[in-house]
Swiss-Prot record:
It comes from Arabidopsis thaliana. InterPro entries: MRS2-like (IPR039204). It is a multi-pass membrane protein. The keyword Zinc-finger does not apply. CDD domains: Mrs2_Mfm1p-like. The chain crosses the membrane at residues 323-343, 359-379. This is Putative magnesium transporter MRS2-9. GO terms for cellular component: membrane. It is found in: Membrane. Its main location: membrane.
Amino acid sequence: MSIDSDVDPSEVSTAKRKPSRSWLLIDAAGNSTMLNVDSYAIIRRVHIYARDLRVFESSISSPLSIRTREGAIVLNLEHIKVIITADEVLLREPLNENVIPVAKEFERRLGVENRERRGQPDGKEDSGAEVDAEKDESPFEFRALEVALEAICSFLAARTTELEKSGYPALNELASKISNRNFGKVHKLKISMLTVRVQKVKDELQLWLEDDDDLGDLCLSRKIATTSSPVSDSDEQINSYPTSPTIGAKISRAKSHLVRSATVRGDDQNDVEEVEMLLEAHYMQIDRTLNKLAELREYLDDTEDYINFQLASSRNKLIEFEVIITAGSVCISVYSLVVGILSTNIPFSWNTKEHMFKWVVSATATLCAIFFVIIISYARYKKLVGN
């Protein structure tokens, strides 16, 4: 995951044409300086590739990532775009409304911990409290990485809390009364979009936790300390002999293995464990946020099932009503047909018989009523109505 300090000229020329960007430089003492420089100046300062800065461009849809280089950690965590070295932090777009709190947190945390490491007071009198004797000896890059991860995890947790506060009442209103207004409230929740954002952070942290060698690449201070190790002397002796390209590649891989082996012994292993605990803590935090979103999604699915059940029940009632109306219409049509026939002004022998018309009409009405009861009874028997 490391690169040489040399910069590719083609990438430099590409970066040089880019306009200047605002950066906030925060050193190990917590002092901040606003920089307005182009990408080439940043590349020369921290020795990274131009493609590492392209992921910061808002016009490019780049995935969330944590990258390590020879002397820098490049973080692209949504709106938090930061480059961390062993002694300074470069924060992109510090005037963004979402980045301003992060910049202040960097200044506060790094400045406070620097004063604690020196045993200096904060400038404010504590109520009889003394500075702990056991100071935080974590490397600068670990403390800066902790601030960045805590910022993105807290940001997503806050968005999740806001979604819960608006989501559960909206779902309850929709369950109690199905309407376009309540449905519009639920449609604006955007649970899936936030879940994808949280899942990306979790996947990135999980990817780093799966390999201890990758965790060792985050120890920038140890990398700098090992540059003057005895391994460098052996490298000079090896490089003094001419080698073929194939043998040179093998020697290069062997040297990389030696350097990697030297950085995971002794105190380096402690640094690996420390950064692993750091990532695990934020992994658990982002996992809790993802669980909250999963619970909200499950509640949404349950509400959707309940609404579908209510709609199906209403649809069944309409079908039952339609069956009853159809049966009644058939019976009334038969009755109207008989009455219409008897009402025609045609000479007929029954016209001379008194009360014959009333008997026929009454009998027809009775038969139609019996026919209607038979239809409804059959529909109930077939469980078409009355369920």
